[in-house]
Structure formats: structure tokens, C-alpha cells
Amino acid sequence: MHPGIGFAILVTAGAWIAACDGSLREKIGQSDIDASVLMTIQPPKCDPSATAADSGACTGGGQPGSDCLMCHHQGGPASPYTFAGTLYDAAGAKPVAGATIYVEDSAGNLATAITRPNGNFFTADGFVQYPAKAFVSLCPDVLEMIGAVDQMTGANCNTSGCHTAGFRIHLP
């Protein structure tokens, strides 16, 4: 086979045989034509304002917008959360209460949380597979997170490399 040619054609007893060099990408999300499984997850309906069971205040000293999973992780000093963060208005200044946060993985496992009066949201509901897709819903808006929640960044929404002081989780 000539270097740089992706396949070879062999002649054997008058029959043509093609051989592949293995460069095809047929794994989910890796093909030029296949879509990611996450693209099949539909946005939730528009949710009316909900009321959380508590204020969302952290008794350990955490503040809205700070790193929730610094303490709230397996083996940490506080009860572990699956995901946590703070929701703000579009300007990133005022906390938004009563919104529903959805995180759904590619296997269909769904975890939800309601934003507290201080904008904090958190849950211990389990989803077990990464990547996952996140939405925030509060009528009339339903917003989808642009990127996937992945194992590398985890579901520590306030510090996963995106949602820090300059780019808060927001609605709308």
C-alpha cells in the first residue's frame, strides 16, 4: 500500500477487495454524521415558580456563588451533593429563586433541584453517568446549558471552569 493512501485494493482471482485503514469514527459523538446522545435529550417544560423547603443558607459559611462542592462531596465535612450552584438574573447580580434545575445523563437518569431564595440549588439525587445535560426552567424561560456536564469538571456548577464571577448561571 502506498503511504498516505487510506485503503488498498487487492486483486485475487478476479475479485476486488477493499481494506479499511481504521480511520472511520463510528463511536457516538465521534463521527462526522452521528449526533451525540445528549442531543436527543429534550428540554423540560416551562415550570412555574416553586418553593424550596429551606432558605438555601449554608451553615458552614458558604456564600451564594462560592464553591459548594468544596465541602459537599463524598468524604467531605458536609453532606454530599450530586450537583450544586447558584442561579442569577441575566445581569449576574441578583439571585433567582423558585427555578427548577434539571441534570439528565445519557442513560436517562434525571436529578432536579429548586433554587432557594438566595439562588442556591443543590441535590443529592443521583445521576451516575457523564456526560450529562443541564437545563434551568422558570416560566416563561427554559434555558439549556451550552456545554455538557462532564466527569472532568463535574457538577460543581460555581467552579467548574465556566460559572465563576464573570459568567454566572443565569435566567433568562
Regions found by a protein language model. Give the residues of each.
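Sec-dependent bacterial lipoprotein signal peptides
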Residues: 1-18
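Sequence context surrounding c-type heme c attachment/ligation sites in exported
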Residues: 19-98, 103-172
